[in-house]
Amino acid sequence: MQDQQIINPISQSQIPQELSENVILSSVSDLYDWARLSSLWPLMYGTACCFIEIAAMIGSRFDFDRFGLVPRSSPRQADLIITAGTVTMKMAPALVRLYEQMPDPKYVIAMGACTITGGMFSSDSTTAVRGVDKLIPVDVYLPGCPPRPEAVMDAIVKLRKKIANEDVRERGNLMQTHRYYSTTHQMKVVPPIHTGVYLEAAARKSPAAALGAGVGEDMTPALVAEAEKEEA
């Protein structure tokens, strides 16, 4: 009677070479992360001069389509927003609304010094937000004034690595417990500047008396003079 060969279960499994080259073992979470990092859809959103570098990336010289980036004009179709340029107090509510309309999971790249700290406007400006992370959570900070397209591509590569290492089941908890908010801005609703009644304003019909006295002649507005001619 032949002795049966005993295979040690602790030893390395005997997988044929053909099978090992055609089968990939992974998890659903890793597959989901790979799909997301390979098809980031950025929102076309720019507030200042940094957006010029984003426009340069769309051209054939840098060709950011090879990263799977598909520019979208609607926040409901995007999962990445690159805040390129200065964010003002008046633009802050619109930015927060755009971020809230993006489906989860969503990512933010703060591009440029003005976006990260306020930049040249951080010392004496009364309208610039000192850091977009006071409004929305930021995943990647990209300093520069403005950053070169190569730097933007490096930030996208780092974001792809971050997505590859995260677990989709933990991202919701991470975004809730590790927020970057440091200051609550009082974003008050203000009336619009252009009301459509500029020509009917009192300053247009009757200028200040001091202005006429300083010039030394009658300062009747042209519109009022034309109306008097038509009535005559």
UniProtKB/Swiss-Prot annotation:
Q: Which GO terms describe its biological process?
A: aerobic respiration; electron transport coupled proton transport; photosynthesis, light reaction
Q: Which Pfam families match?
A: Oxidored_q6
Q: Which GO terms describe its molecular function?
A: 4 iron, 4 sulfur cluster binding; iron ion binding; NADH dehydrogenase (ubiquinone) activity; quinone binding
Catalytic activity of the protein: a plastoquinone + NADH + (n+1) H(+)(in) = a plastoquinol + NAD(+) + n H(+)(out); a plastoquinone + NADPH + (n+1) H(+)(in) = a plastoquinol + NADP(+) + n H(+)(out)
Membrane topology is:
Peripheral membrane protein
Q: What is its main location?
A: membrane
What does the cofactor section's free text say about binding? Binds 1 [4Fe-4S] cluster.
Subcellular location, record wording = Cellular thylakoid membrane
The record lists its disulfide bonds as: none
Q: Name one GO cellular component term.
A: plasma membrane-derived thylakoid membrane
Give the similarity note: Belongs to the complex I 20 kDa subunit family.
- Job description of the protein: NDH-1 shuttles electrons from an unknown electron donor, via FMN and iron-sulfur (Fe-S) centers, to quinones in the respiratory and/or the photosynthetic chain. The immediate electron acceptor for the enzyme in this species is believed to be plastoquinone. Couples the redox reaction to proton translocation, and thus conserves the redox energy in a proton gradient. Cyanobacterial NDH-1 also plays a role in inorganic carbon-concentration.
Protein's recorded name: NAD(P)H-quinone oxidoreductase subunit K 1
In its UniProt entry, the species of origin is given as Acaryochloris marina (strain MBIC 11017)
Query: Source taxonomy lineage?
Result: Bacteria, Bacillati, Cyanobacteriota, Cyanophyceae, Acaryochloridales
